[in-house]
């Protein structure tokens, strides 16, 4: 079979391009008939990359990191889009599909602090940089005395900002730091019991057009089954909640033998209440388990987790 050029769409940050390169290598490894020169990576600047000083919720939400890339995919300017799954809205875009995932990296959160100080040894009223409502509330659960402050930008930008006087520490995803080769910067790795991660954290997602059979047959060979099941459960929970970047929600699924386990946390909008739900079941019922988790969290929280607009 003769193949034309396959264009992979990606954000332009160093980390995003590493994700795209990883996806490209995986596609080539699992499709030996493809010549490496057939796959090209195209950088697409997203709204989230352009506006790096405001909260995502103030300028349009999670789709800011994916909408421009999806437009290119729908217009057939690219054939595949590579995303960090945690950046994708829970509702899929019409005529596009996200159901191929590379093997999940470590989903835990990490702390980078000045002078390499442990989280629990930071001085009273230290300022922690984060761009996530979820992290803000989880930090407050662990230490009410700490101050959280918005920080935006890519990993290098955030580390650079830490060198100034605004922040004493920042919290980031371990997967990104590891991928960038900056593990030596880590002051502490949080357990998932301390800080439950964002839905989809550590997962690279590959998106395509639903009706593009040739491309879908190529990319399905790289799909990691366990990661797929975990993503299915976590994202279904988020979908039921109608969760967006204003929703302080965490979720982590794991597969052990023939069972899937899903741990979830949801915070009220004022951060005063935390709702917890853990569920497990047969791994082939991942979506159903995610749905049940979402419904249970709503039954506990009511509308307390939503901003009245």
Identify the residue ranges that each predicted region occupies.
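Small-molecule-sensing regulatory modules
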Residues: 2-52, 58-59, 66, 85, ...
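Mixed-charge, polar/low-complexity N-terminal
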Residues: 3, 46, 54, 60, ...
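N-terminal glycine-rich phosphate/adenylate-binding segment common to multiple enzyme folds
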Residues: 61-100, 106-107
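Alpha-helical segments flanking ligand/cofactor-binding loops in enzyme cores
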Residues: 71, 119-120, 160
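A conserved helix-loop-strand patch within extracytoplasmic ligand-binding domains
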Residues: 85-86, 94-146
